[in-house]
């Protein structure tokens, strides 16, 4: 959010000092996470079609499955457990939070996952939902499938070879 506000403009009522702005952005992130978690817990933000089946088939064949997100680790773990159930969640490795110095489109989080799971990046398949994630996966040397959503379809279809419409 800081980068966005610095690039566009800080809201008129936003704090003026760097320290106050840092606290302001942290409070926005916290509130966003609370609202997002409420949507997940109420099942108002379900998995995209086909995701659960894909995960089940991968796990059933012994494929290593990971979730890579620069969001808060606690929130990501809760989301995975809530949407996929605790049995699946315990079989999925989560890379989240500030485990890498740079966020997507930098490939660091994907490369960390591949290294940790001892998998060659070229044999990884990433399922993403954005151009930023697609760029990160490609920069890591990984194949990428982008799922369609209302907020990304028009831009993503021009940048990738595989768009999943389910």
Describe these PLM feature segments.
Residues 22, 37-67:
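Short, acidic loop-to-helix structural element flanking the phosphoryl-transfer center
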Residues 5-9, 64-68, 80-85:
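N-terminal-biased segments
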Residues 17, 48-49, 153:
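Sparse recognition of residues in long alpha-helices and their boundaries
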Residues 26, 30, 34, 45, ...:
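Generic detection of well-ordered alpha-helical segments
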Residues 20-24, 43, 105, 129:
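Conserved acidic
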Residues 15, 23, 41, 66, ...:
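Short, flexible active-site loop motifs that bind/organize anionic cofactors or intermediates
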Residues 1-39:
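A metal-dependent, Asp-based hydrolase signature
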Residues 52, 56, 72-166:
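Asp-based, Mg2+/Mn2+-dependent phosphohydrolase catalytic module
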């Amino acid at each position: 959010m800081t980068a966005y506000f610095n690039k566009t403009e800080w809201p008129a009522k936003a704090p003026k000092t760097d320290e106050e702005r840092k606290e302001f952005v942290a409070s926005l992130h916290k509130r966003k996470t609370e609202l997002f978690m409420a949507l997940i817990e109420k099942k108002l933000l379900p998995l995209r079609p086909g995701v659960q089946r894909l995960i089940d088939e991968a796990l059933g064949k012994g494929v290593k499955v990971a979730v890579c997100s620069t969001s808060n680790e606690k929130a990501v773990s809760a989301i995975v457990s809530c949407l996929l159930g605790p049995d699946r969640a315990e079989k999925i490795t989560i890379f989240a939070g500030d485990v890498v110095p740079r966020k997507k489109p930098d490939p660091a989080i994907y490369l960390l996952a591949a290294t940790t799971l001892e998998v060659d990046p070229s044999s990884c398949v990433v399922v993403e939902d954005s151009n930023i994630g697609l760029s990160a996966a490609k920069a890591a040397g990984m194949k990428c499938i982008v799922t369609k959503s209302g907020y990304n379809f028009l831009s993503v279809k021009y940048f990738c070879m595989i768009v999943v419409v389910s």
